[in-house]
C-alpha cells in the first residue's frame, strides 16, 4: 500500500513531468545513501552532455519501487540492494539488459560521538534503551541489520528497543542528535557525519551490500539513461564513489 507521504512524492514527480519534457532532464531515483555521491557525480556527467540536467529523487529503495510501480516518470533506478531491483525486474519496470552493480558498502553500528558503547553485545544492556534502524519492509539497511541481529541471536531480545526509520539518513540523524543510543547505518553515512557519530563496530552476518542500477523501461529518453548508467562505471564516477567511502562493484 502506498502511504499518503508516498503519494505526495509521486504527485510532485508527476506534476513536474510536463516541464521536464521540454528540457533534457534525466530523472534518477536513487537510494538515500547514494545521495551525496550522486550529487557529486552529476556535474561530471553534465559537463560531458551539454544541455542535460540530472534530477535526483532520493528515498528508501522500497519507496522508490512503489513510486515507479505507480507511474512516476523516472529514467534510472538505483537501489541499495539486489532484492528491490529484482522485484522491479519481475514487474518489468526496468530494462534488465542495462542492469549493473555500481558500488558496494558495509553496515556499521554507530553511537553518538560521546557515547561509551562498547560493541554489539552491549545493545542488550540496560544503558541502551533505543536502537534506530530502517524499516525492513522498505529500507535495505534495516533488512541487513535484521539479518545480522538474527545471526547473532539478538533480534527477538532487542524488539522493545527498536526505533524504525524511513531511511538510513533518518537513522543517522537520530543518532547524531542523541535521540537514540545506537543505530545501524552504512559506513558511507557514518563517514559523512564524522564528529557527530562514532563507529562502534562493523557488522557482519548479512547479505552482501551491493548497489545495482538500471534504466527504467518506461524512460522517455532511454539512450540518455543508458549513457548515465554506463557513466557510473567510468573511472571518474568510480573515483567519486570511492572518495565517498563506497567499495568497488
Task: Give a label for each model feature.
Residues 15-17, 218:
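Local alpha-helix boundary/kink/capping signal
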Residues 14-15, 83:
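Short, linear, compositionally biased motifs with a strong N-terminal bias
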Residues 23-49, 53-70, 79-82, 86-249:
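Exported/periplasmic ABC-transporter solute-binding proteins
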Residues 1-12, 19-20:
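Bacterial N-terminal signal peptides that target proteins for export
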Amino acid at each position: 500500500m502506498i502511504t499518503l507521504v508516498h503519494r505526495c512524492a509521486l504527485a510532485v514527480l508527476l506534476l513536474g513531468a510536463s516541464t521536464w519534457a521540454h528540457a533534457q532532464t534525466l530523472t534518477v531515483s536513487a537510494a538515500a545513501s547514494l545521495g551525496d555521491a550522486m550529487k557529486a557525480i552529476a556535474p561530471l556527467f553534465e559537463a560531458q552532455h551539454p544541455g542535460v540536467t540530472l534530477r535526483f529523487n532520493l528515498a528508501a529503495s522500497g519507496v522508490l519501487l512503489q513510486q515507479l510501480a505507480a507511474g512516476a516518470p523516472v529514467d534510472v533506478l538505483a537501489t541499495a540492494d539486489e532484492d528491490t531491483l529484482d522485484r522491479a525486474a519481475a514487474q518489468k519496470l526496468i530494462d534488465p539488459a542495462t542492469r549493473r552493480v555500481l558500488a558496494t558498502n558495509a553496515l556499521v553500528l554507530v553511537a553518538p560521538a560521546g557515547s561509551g558503547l562498547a560493541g554489539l553485545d552491549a545493545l542488550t544492556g540496560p544503558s541502551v534503551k533505543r536502537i534506530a534502524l530502517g524499516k525492513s519492509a522498505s529500507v535495505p539497511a534495516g533488512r541487513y541489520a535484521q539479518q545480522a541481529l538474527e545471526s547473532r541471536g539478538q533480534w527477538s531480545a532487542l524488539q522493545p528497543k527498536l526505533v524504525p526509520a524511513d531511511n538510513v539518513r533518518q537513522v543517522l540523524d537520530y543518532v547524531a542528535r542523541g535521540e537514540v543510543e545506537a543505530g545501524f547505518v552504512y559506513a558511507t553515512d557514518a563517514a559523512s557525519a564524522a564528529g557527530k557519530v562514532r563507529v562502534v563496530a562493523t557488522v557482519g552476518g548479512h547479505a552482501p551490500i551491493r548497489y545495482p542500477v538500471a534504466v527504467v523501461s518506461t524512460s522517455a529518453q532511454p539512450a540518455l539513461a543508458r549513457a548515465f548508467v554506463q557513466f557510473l562505471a567510468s573511472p571518474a564516477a568510480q573515483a567519486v564513489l570511492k572518495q565517498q567511502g563506497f567499495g568497488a562493484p
